[in-house]
Amino acid sequence: DELTRVMQKTMPSKRLEQIRDVFVFSCFTGLAYCDARALTREHIITGSNNRPWLRTHRQKTSTPVDVPLLDVPLQILAKYEGCSGNDRLLPIPANQKCNDYLKEIAAICGIEKRLTFHLARHTFATTVTLTNGVPIESVSKMLGHRSLKTTQIYAKIVNDKLAEDMTNLSTRLQHLAM
């Protein structure tokens, strides 16, 4: 899929590699651009499972957010440890610059979809969590949504994709009909 392509593609420059890594980090944490950019060491805590978690507040809504860190974001954090003199965890430039670089990354990876930082949050909700069986209530909490209704928009997208996939499968399996 597209996320795997972005993750596995060798980038032609350090700058694009950093933006790719930050984008992937958000795909696996669900953090919005401004929340990811604001992360410092203090935002990493030991969660109830004795593993590292992110604890922050969504700048947009002031909602508290706790996200258990999977291996991919942990590897990215380790890669950029001490990357900036200002205590930030990740080397994230201005949002417009990020989105310009993401456009380049999409072209390099042969992705026609418009890559933006917000798409990373959407990818976390759909591709990373909901399609892998994470309950919608947990996804909603990690995204910092105040209402489950907001998260249900993502669940509808997943269901629409599921319906499309099953229609395609049905077409391919028609020759097996009894």
Report each predicted region and the residues it spans:
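Basic, Lys/Arg- and aromatic-enriched nucleic-acid-binding interface segment
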Residues: D1-Y33, R51, C83, N132
